Amino acid sequence: MPEEKIVCQNLGHVYPRGKIVALENVNLTICSQEIIGVIGQNGSGKTTLVKHFNGLLKPTSGKVIVEGNDTAKKKVQELAAHVGYVFQNPNHQLFAKTVEHELEFGPTNLGLSREEVEERREKAIEFFGLQDLRLSHPYRISFPLRKLVSMAAVYTMRPAVFILDEPTTGQDNITTRTVYRLIERLREEGSTVICVAHDMILLAEVVDRMIVMRNSHLIADASPREVFSDTELMHSTHITPPQITSIGLRWPGFGEKKVLLSVDEAVTAINSSNPPANS
């Protein structure tokens, strides 16, 4: 049975400056080995929501429970062992002189032995394919690779939950596909992954559930297929489904409306609706 990792109970948050209501009455449960997508327009509350998961923000009302810990009673440093946050811009996260040193910082702060620190560093280098970059300065490598280093730095902390803020922003196609595979591998290792993203292809092809935010409220919690097929929801949130999904819903060649999430699904649908002629 899936283990509950994060539970939000009637969560509300008001920013003191300007008394802006950022979250209102959010109820949500996220379990082990789920891949979750969080979407919504700017200002909808999605970033405010996930910053409660690692204690960067504290509830104004309600509760957030992370692996049995009430976040209101825990310091950010304590929650870092449970939830790792990878920022959208790696420049806000990286500071060491080499990739190796960057990957050693987190586990060293956890008080691990030198042997354990080196073991975690080497595991991260292997997992993220950073062998040729270990002695490079993080700011002297490309932006896409820098984002992988920032993910690897969080990986060395071994959190149960990873929060990835726009993980494919600024990535080329090759590195984007690498990120997709890494997210799947994190799940295979037992992690829960939460992606705050505008990348609809990532959400369609990789995540299990989509959390849709609008005007400080959680308005939908469903599979990508259910969310992308809800035209009223898409319209009200000003979100555009992946192009292949829009084609499937509109193209009469399939014989019926198809909620397609990938090109592979489109190929299968086309082949099944147009069987080869008998020779």
State the predicted function of each range.
Residues 2-8, 13-25, 73-75:
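A short, flexible loop at the N-terminus of ABC-type nucleotide-binding domains that lies
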Residues 162-165:
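Catalytic Walker B motif of ABC-type/P-loop ATPase nucleotide-binding domains
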Residues 54:
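Helix-to-loop junction immediately C-terminal to a conserved catalytic motif
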